[in-house]
Amino acid sequence: MKHHRLAIVRQKYRPDGGAERFVSRALTALSNQNLELNVITREWQGEKQDDWHIHICDPRKWGRISRERGFAHAARALWQQQQFDIVQSHERIPGCDIYRAGDGVHRRWLLQRTRILPAWRAQMLMHDRYHRYVMNAEREM
């Protein structure tokens, strides 16, 4: 029987984070399910089982936008080259099969935040280059 190839994408894996606990539990639960388990990450700090394939994807970064954009491009290129059957991402990367919006929708969060800010600060927040990048990535998904 053919193994389905699953890739889980998490930019940075630290064992103490919420999304990371989700990833770890999912990998453990899926270990005996006739799946090839792959993780695409910039950095892995946790324990791993022998049947997990950790793919380190660590492009250069100069700031928040280049960190997000660089990882998104590199991760997508890797999963396309590897031809995984299912790609589940915890990052806002267009082209994944399943997206876990653990942080919610960024635009909704920004709108909630602007409610408590002076008008000039709210406008600056909504026009910030990083926040515009994140909202655009969500739109592309």
What do the predicted segments below correspond to?
Residues K61-V87, C96, H131-A137:
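An amphipathic, basic-hydrophobic alpha-helix
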Residues G18-R25:
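Conserved alpha-helical elements of sugar-nucleotide-dependent glycosyltransferases
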Residues I98-A137, M141:
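Acceptor-binding helix/loop patch of EC 2.4 sugar-transfer enzymes
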Residues K12-Y13, I93, V105:
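Flexible, active-site-proximal loop/turn residues at the rims of small-molecule/cofactor binding pockets
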Residues L6, V87, Y99:
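Receiver (REC) domain switch-region micro-motif
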Residues S89-I93, A101:
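Short His-centered aromatic/hydrophobic patch
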Residues H3, R10-D16, A29-S66:
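N-terminal strand-loop element at the rim of the active site
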